[in-house]
């Protein structure tokens, strides 16, 4: 009579919100880099260097960039962006749908609407 014991281990994916928050933190603290070209024995070599020396240098786990994002506030046919002018925003939101962010500092107009709609309610 023998007994068997099985042990199974697996990795579980973290909650989607946790991953999103982590990536947003990385994005918000990304380091701007510059490309430097220098000559070595094997030819020209390009390396990345932090643009601002007064900040701590990025680690291997930090997010870095060397090109700025396009201006999404204004229309850009090249990127297919329509810009944010005349978009509906949420005055009370501090998120991506909020007027502060979506209106790009241009200000916004507040409009109050009163609607009458048939709701097909059953009481």
UniProtKB/Swiss-Prot annotation:
Protein's name in the database: Protein Wnt-3b
Lipid attachment residues per UniProt (O-palmitoleoyl serine): 1
Disulfide bond positions: 89-104
Key word Cell inner membrane present: no
Family: Belongs to the Wnt family.
Known function: Ligand for members of the frizzled family of seven transmembrane receptors. Probable developmental protein. May be a signaling molecule which affects the development of discrete regions of tissues. Is likely to signal over only few cell diameters.
Organism: Alopias vulpinus (Common thresher shark)
GO cellular component terms, semicolon-separated: extracellular space
Transmembrane segments: none
Primary location class: secreted
Entries under Gene3D superfamilies matching the protein: 3.30.2460.20
Localization, UniProt: Secreted, Extracellular space, Extracellular matrix
Glycosylation site positions: 90
Record-level Gene Ontology MF annotations: cytokine activity; frizzled binding
GO BP of this protein: canonical Wnt signaling pathway; cell fate commitment; neuron differentiation
InterPro entries found in the cross-reference section: Wnt, Wnt_C
Name of a matching Pfam family: wnt
